[in-house]
C-alpha cells in the first residue's frame, strides 16, 4: 500500500523523470498523442475555464496542455523536485503557479475558487484515506457547478483476487492481526505471488493503491458533499482487468443525487495502440526511411 512517504521516495527523484515523464506515454506513441486521444476527448466538456487546479502534476506532462485552457492554473505536488521542475518549465507562463504540499493538503487554494480540478496518472498510487482527504477539500475548493476529473485506482474492486499486490499477499490468513478475511488456500496463493514479485517475476500493478475503488470514491464523495456524476472503469497495462477508474465529480446541489453513470471499458490499451500505430503509419508516409 503506497504511503505518502513511499510515493515521495518513488516519484521525487529526478533520475526517475527522464524526458519529463514522457516515457509513460510510450504506449500511445508519445505524450501529445495520449493527450489528444485519451484525455482531451474526456475533459473537453469542462474546459476552457478561468481557473484549473491540477493535483500531482509531476514534471508537467499534462500541465503543458492544460495551461492553454485557463486564465490561472494552480499545480500542487508532494514532491519538491516536481514542483521545482514545473516552475522552471513554465517560467514563461505567469498564470501557472506551483506549490509543494504534504501529499493531501489544498490549503494554498482559496475556497470556491476552482472551476475545474484535474489529476491523471498520479492518484492511482494514492490510497483511500488520501483520496478522501482531497475530496473533502475539493468539496470546499470547487465553485458551485464546477467539476473534477480524477484518475484513481480501482484495484480494491479485486480484493478477492489472488492477483493483488504483495502487501496484501503478506497479510495473515483468516483475518488475523487485522488482515482481510480470506481462506487459507487464497492466502497461500497470495503468498506465492508475493515471492514471485520479490524475485522480479511478477509486476504488481505498478504500485496501484489497493484500498481504492470506484465504489470507495463514490462513498467518499457522499461524505464530502460531492456528487459523483460518471465513472469509467478502464484497463491499464495488465490485460482486461479494470484496475483504474476515471471519475467525474461536482459539488452536490440541493436536488436529490442520482447514481453515477458507469462505463466498463476494457479497451483503453487498444485505444493507445491504435493511436500509436496510426501515427507511425502517417509518419512513415512522410519519411523515406
Model-derived regions, located:
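Conserved S-adenosyl-L-methionine
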Residues: 56
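A conserved beta-strand element that flanks and buttresses the S-adenosyl-L-methionine
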Residues: 118
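A short glycine-rich, Lys/Arg-flanked "PGG" loop and its adjoining helix->strand segment in the class I
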Residues: 132-144
